[in-house]
Swiss-Prot record:
It is found in: Cell inner membrane. Belongs to the complex I 30 kDa subunit family. It comes from the Bacteria. It catalyses: a quinone + NADH + 5 H(+)(in) = a quinol + NAD(+) + 4 H(+)(out). NDH-1 is composed of 14 different subunits. Subunits NuoB, C, D, E, F, and G constitute the peripheral sector of the complex. It is a peripheral membrane protein. Its EC number is 7.1.1.-. One of its GO terms (molecular function) is quinone binding. InterPro entries: NADH_DH_suC, NADH_quin_OxRdtase_su_C/D-like, NADH_UbQ_OxRdtase_30kDa_su, NADH_UbQ_OxRdtase_CS. PANTHER family: NADH DEHYDROGENASE [UBIQUINONE] IRON-SULFUR PROTEIN 3, MITOCHONDRIAL, NADH DEHYDROGENASE UBIQUINONE IRON-SULFUR PROTEIN 3. This is NADH-quinone oxidoreductase subunit C. It is an enzyme of class 7 (translocase). The gene is nuoC.
Length: 199
């Protein structure tokens, strides 16, 4: 893993105290930084000749509220980016936590990597993470009037409203969810009675 050791040393040298944590697992490095340092770190990751992460491949939101079966005691929302350096042929995962769990806000890195445009919109749509400085932060996958953020752990599985076609009105209508919650108990089939005949 000389390549990872080289990357780790370069990150520690260039970023210094901005490195909140650097985790090596399954042959990959994850860099964790504070929200206040996020934009500056992103620029350094892209522009420093010893790092040169030219491409942001993906960004997703994460809700850690139920992480480790509720044992997680850190901040709730994070943005996780996957970065690629074509120059040095290495990858990095960059994680930043929003400092406020009630209203998660992070700076947008769209002026560093413009490929993040729709990724930040998706994280806003699904998790409610607001990216300050994003030029067009609006929903991208849910409906215009959608209430809430469906990938949050506290969002109900059945949702709040359902959409259906009403043949009388000849249009799509929204109405409160009519699904009744039920408990599903698995049916146990004993081996001796499998298939309906006794063996």
């Amino acid at each position: 893993m000389a390549n990872l050791d080289t990357l780790k040393a370069a990150l520690e040298k260039v970023l210094g105290k901005r490195v909140q944590n650097l985790i090596e697992a399954t042959g990959e490095l994850t860099l964790i930084v504070k929200a206040a340092d996020y934009l500056e770190v992103a620029r350094l990751l892209r522009d420093d000749p010893s790092l040169r992460f030219e491409q942001l491949l993906d960004l997703c939101g994460v809700d850690y509220s139920d992480y480790a079966e509720g044992a997680w005691d850190g901040l709730r929302f994070a943005a996780v980016s996957q970065l690629l350096s074509v120059t040095h042929n290495w990858r990095l995962r960059l994680r930043v936590f929003a400092p406020d769990d009630d209203f998660p806000v992070l700076p947008s890195v769209i002026n560093v990597w413009n490929s993040v445009n729709w990724f930040e919109r998706e994280a806003f749509d699904f998790y409610g993470i607001v990216f300050e400085g994003h030029p067009d932060l609006r929903r991208i996958l849910t409906d215009y009037g959608f209430v809430g953020h469906p990938f949050r752990k506290d969002f109900p599985v059945s949702g709040y409203v359902e959409m259906r076609y009403d043949p009388e009105q000849k249009r799509v209508i929204y109405q409160p969810v009519t699904i009744e919650p039920r408990e599903v108990t698995p049916r146990v089939i004993r081996e001796e009675n499998y298939g309906g005949t006794q063996h």
